Swiss-Prot record:
This is Ubiquitin-associated protein 1. Residues 260-290 are annotated as: Interaction with PTPN23. One of its GO terms (molecular function) is ubiquitin binding. The modification Phosphoserine is found at S146, S205, S289. Ubiquitous. Highly expressed in heart, liver, brain, kidney, spleen, skeletal muscle, stomach, testis and lung. Component of an ESCRT-I complex (endosomal sorting complex required for transport I) which consists of TSG101, VPS28, VPS37A and UBAP1 in a 1:1:1:1 stoichiometry. Interacts with PTPN23. Interacts (via UBA domains) with ubiquitinated proteins. It comes from Mus musculus. Residues 1-95 are annotated as: Interaction with ESCRT-I. It comes from the Eukaryota. The gene is Ubap1. The UMA domain mediates association with the ESCRT-I complex. CDD domains: UBA1_UBAP1 (cd14315), UBA2_UBAP1_like (cd14316). Residues 80-117, 135-156 are annotated as: Disordered. Component of the ESCRT-I complex, a regulator of vesicular trafficking process. Binds to ubiquitinated cargo proteins and is required for the sorting of endocytic ubiquitinated cargos into multivesicular bodies (MVBs). Plays a role in the proteasomal degradation of ubiquitinated cell-surface proteins, such as EGFR and BST2. Keywords: Cytoplasm, Endosome, Phosphoprotein, Protein transport, Repeat, Transport. The lineage of its organism: Eukaryota, Metazoa, Chordata, Craniata, Vertebrata.
Length: 502
């Protein structure tokens, strides 16, 4: 062990290593001095070089070997040239018979050649194994040089990759929005007008529709006869103000009717039946929704033909059709006009039977196959729908026909305007996030703040839900997340500071 003290001229009068013992390794120590023996002296290099005698014998032998190799190569080339000349003469005189004679002098020439001085260098110049065999006849040469014929049973296509039918799948995809737009273009105004005339002629005189706006909107109502998606098992008729809506189970299987003579005699088939039965159901539901409209500003309640109990479906009060005995879910025979009351006594709202409480007039909307849209149940949404312009109302009706509710479509249109594609994108993103379990109010906040980034929306919703469970206010959570760009730690510190200050 040793102790080391640094000089006072560097660190002053004291050092941090004073009286501190530490060990120094051998490799850091100064090497010991080695003394040369007495009389040892190194020779002078220049004197050694001057006294050295170098004869360059190896270099001279190498040059001689190179010259001998050149002579051997020239002798080989001369022998080959003479052999070719002799072979050409023999071929011109005797033809193929001279082949065996030519090979002997060639081998004799190669045998009489002197052996190479350096076999290693000589072997690098020529390789007898790879020397091609010489032939005499030109026909034989053409036969040898011609490519080999492929076998008849060989098919190169057997070794190629099989075409995957899914490779071209992307080329066959369609634009869903364009297809939906094309589907919603067709109209069935004349069909609805004929149906309305035939039914109102059989009804009472007080059930005649006098509202020209209702008739005009009825002619413009569009119907799609191709199912867009499988419904939820119910055919729901539209709810009109105080009129209670009727629900029909999809399990009911009734025989089809060739002519539509009475609203009670219509058959409501299964939802996966053919297009003609689906057309009958749609025409009936559309006519029923428009026949309950009054020319003034009121509607009457829907009266059942016999006693029936009100059931509740999806949160809305519905009144079943006891005349069709749909509660049992079994098949019921077709009811004719002689067995059932006329259309006017059941569903057409007359002026005398209208309740004292007036309701605003509703313009009939477009209905699709898979779902008949409900009128907005919220009075505020109902009044907002009436305040829209015709183009805005048409935009709302188009999106509602795709299966969305009025409230969601109106909220989306307030944020995105009348652009149907942007409304559909907004509703699709909103529905996906709600299906993942997020609060709809938080989803709307996320779509408003981070609509362009799905990753930031998910991060924002997760932090909002987490901070909301901690008990913080939504307003403060939104402010701090926007301020700190979804930074969890900084946002939590800010929220804690605000909570402590309050």
């Amino acid at each position: 062990m040793a102790s080391k003290k640094l000089g006072t001229d560097v660190h002053g009068t004291f050092s941090y290593l004073d009286d501190v013992p530490f060990k120094i390794g051998d490799k850091f120590k100064t090497p010991a001095k080695v003394g040369l023996p007495i009389g040892f002296s190194l020779p002078d290099c220049l004197q050694v070089v001057r006294e050295m005698q170098y004869d360059f014998s190896l270099e001279k032998k190498t040059i001689e070997w190179a010259e001998d190799i050149k002579l051997i190569q020239e002798a080989q080339r001369e022998a080959e040239r003479k052999a070719e000349e002799a072979e050409a003469k023999v071929n011109s005189k005797s033809g193929p018979e001279g082949d065996s004679k030519v090979s002997f002098p060639k081998t004799h020439n190669t045998a009489t050649m002197p052996p190479p001085i350096n076999p290693i260098l000589a072997s690098l110049q020529h390789n007898n194994i790879l020397t091609p065999t010489r032939v005499s006849s030109s026909a034989t040469k053409q036969k040898v040089l011609s490519p080999p014929h492929t076998k008849a049973d060989f098919n190169p296509a057997d070794f190629e990759c099989e075409e995957d039918p899914f490779d071209n799948l992307e080329l066959k995809t369609i634009d869903e929005k364009e297809e939906l737009r094309n589907i919603l273009v067709g109209t069935t105004g004349p069909i609805m007008a004929q149906l309305l005339d035939s039914n109102t002629a059989r009804g009472s005189s007080g059930a005649v529709l006098q509202d020209e706006e209702v008739l005009a909107s009825l002619e413009q109502a569009t119907l799609d006869f191709k199912p867009l998606h499988k419904p939820n098992g119910f055919i729901t008729l539209p709810q009109l103000g105080n009129c209670e809506k009727m629900s029909l189970s999809s399990k009911v299987s009734l025989p089809p009717i060739p002519t539509v003579s009475n609203i009670k005699s219509l058959s409501f088939p299964k939802l996966d039946s053919d297009d003609s039965n689906q057309k009958t159901v749609k025409l009936a539901s559309t006519f029923h929704s428009t026949s309950c409209l009054r020319s003034g500003a009121s509607r009457s309640l829907l009266k059942p033909s016999t006693q029936s109990s009100a059931s509740e479906l999806n949160g809305d009060h519905t009144l079943g059709l006891s005349a069709l005995n749909l509660n049992s879910g079994t098949e019921v025979p077709t009811l004719t006009s002689s067995q059932m009351p006329s259309l006017s006594s059941v569903s057409v709202c007359t002026e005398e039977s209208s309740p004292p409480d007036p309701c605003p007039t509703v313009t009939p909307l477009n209905f699709s196959v898979s779902q008949v849209p409900n009128m907005p149940s919220c009075p505020q949404a109902y009044l907002e729908l009436q305040a829209l312009s015709p183009s805005e109302r048409q935009c709302v009706e188009t999106v509602v026909n795709m299966g969305y509710s009025y409230d969601c479509v109106l909220r989306a249109m307030r944020k995105k305007g009348e652009n149907i594609e942007q409304i559909l994108d907004y509703l699709f993103a909103h529905g996906q996030l709600c299906e993942k379990g997020f609060d709809p109010l938080l989803v709307e906040e996320a779509l408003e703040m981070h609509q362009c980034s799905e990753e930031k929306m998910m991060e924002f919703l997760q932090l909002m839900s987490k901070f909301k469970e901690m008990g913080f206010e939504l307003k403060d959570i939104k402010e701090v997340l926007l301020l700190h760009n979804n930074d969890q730690d900084n946002a939590l510190e800010d929220l804690m500071a605000r909570a402590g200050a309050s």
